Design a protein with these regions (language model features):
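Arg/Lys-rich, positively charged N-terminal/basic patches that mediate binding to nucleic acids
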Residues: 1-28
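Residues that form or immediately flank small-molecule/cofactor binding pockets and catalytic motifs
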Residues: 8, 47, 78
Length: 94
């Protein structure tokens, strides 16, 4: 799967600390290697997106929108208070 990084996603990725950035990069490679969309399907305004945890005990999530042979990475961040999902919805609505 080819990865498409939105400009907002790039900024969010650069704002993470280096150790979180490495874990997110590994998860991005998992998405890239997958033949089908992986992660949890989302509902509501993000029903066209999926969310994947970056690690077993991680609170970081990547929200992405799968297409035929590509995945558009929309947002990355902590799940605390569903902030990453609210940001992803705002990004997609604009």
């Amino acid at each position: 799967m080819r990865l498409i990084l939105r400009p907002e996603y790039r900024r969010m990725l650069l704002s993470l600390d280096p150790s979180e950035g490495r874990v997110v990069t590994r998860t991005m490679r998992r998405i890239e290697r997958a033949r089908e969309a992986i992660g949890k399907p989302l509902r509501g305004g993000l029903s066209m997106c999926r969310s994947i945890r970056t690690g077993h005990n991680s609170r970081l999530r990547i929200v992405y929108r799968p297409f035929d042979n590509a995945a558009e990475l929309v947002a990355v961040g902590k799940r605390e208070g569903k902030v990453v999902y609210i940001i992803a919805l705002e990004i997609l609505e604009n």
